[in-house]
Every structure is written in structure tokens, then in C-alpha cells.
């Protein structure tokens, strides 16, 4: 799941919440990359949003934070090289999130289809539509 998913979720986007609840009925937990975790925590700290930070930390405690491993770093490096060679680079953070997802055989939930859609072998879902 990317940062945009959490923004939709914590802003009570009805369709995102509905799909989130359906997902949890089937899988029990959400997987969060350490990169997404960093993006959200750093953004909340920058805004001094302590209440939202506490809420997010509680949410995370019930779910799984996936680390950046050597395997996911190698996959990310392959993605980076492939996109650069095609002349279609995207942000390194998005590449790292994708590498973690591919290494763990997971789907990315995001509304950033423009960038994540450039990555081969990555399944994407947009729960906001």
C-alpha cells in the first residue's frame, strides 16, 4: 500500500474504507513497506500532527511492516535500470516500494497508476475508483 492509500483511508474515503474492510475480512492484516511507513511518519512529523501519528502507529501495530531486503533492493535496482534505459524514470521511493512488493509477491494499492504502471511484473489496484 502506498502513502496515497493511507491518505484516502484516514480521510474516510468511503470506497477505500469499503475495500479495506473487505480485504481485512479475507487476509486479516495489511502489509506496509518500510518506505511507505517512512513517508507517512516523516510527513506527519513535519506537520507536527501528533494525533494522526499516534493513530497511524496504532494502525501499524496491528499490521505488517515489510523491510527493504537485499532481494528487494536488487529487484528495485533492476526496475531502476529498466526504466532509465527506456527513458521513463520514476521516483526512487516508488521504485523501492515496488521492489518490496514484487519481492513479497504482493499487489500495490495506489492511485499513482501513472508511475507504478510503468513497472513490469507489478500488479496494481486503485481502491479509490
Which positions does each model-derived feature cover?
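Histidine- and aromatic-rich ligand-binding microenvironments
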Residues: 1-2, 33, 90-91, 112
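Generic structural signal for small/hydrophobic residues in well-ordered secondary structure
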Residues: 2-3, 16, 40, 76, ...
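Active-site neighborhoods of divalent-metal-dependent phosphate/nucleic-acid chemistry enzymes
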Residues: 64-109
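Alpha-helix capping/helix-boundary segments
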Residues: 5, 36, 72, 97, ...
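Hydrophobic/aromatic residues within well-ordered alpha-helical segments
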Residues: 36, 48, 52, 72-75
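Acidic, PIN/NYN-like endoribonuclease modules and their adjacent C-terminal/linker elements
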Residues: 22, 98, 102-129
Amino acid at each position: 500500500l502506498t502513502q496515497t492509500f493511507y491518505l484516502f483511508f484516514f480521510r474516510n474515503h468511503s470506497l477505500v474504507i469499503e475495500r479495506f474492510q473487505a480485504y481485512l475480512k479475507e487476509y486479516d492484516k495489511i502489509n506496509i513497506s518500510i518506505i511507505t511507513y517512512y513517508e507517512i511518519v516523516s510527513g506527519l512529523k513535519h506537520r507536527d500532527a501528533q494525533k494522526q501519528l499516534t493513530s497511524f502507529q496504532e494502525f501499524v501495530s496491528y499490521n505488517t511492516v515489510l523491510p527493504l531486503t537485499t532481494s528487494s533492493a536488487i529487484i528495485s535496482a533492476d526496475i531502476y535500470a529498466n526504466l532509465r534505459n527506456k527513458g521513463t524514470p520514476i521516483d526512487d521511493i516508488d521504485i523501492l516500494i515496488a521492489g518490496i512488493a514484487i519481492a513479497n509477491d504482493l499487489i500495490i494499492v495506489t492511485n499513482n497508476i501513472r508511475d507504478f504502471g510503468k513497472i513490469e511484473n507489478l500488479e496494481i489496484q486503485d481502491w479509490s475508483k
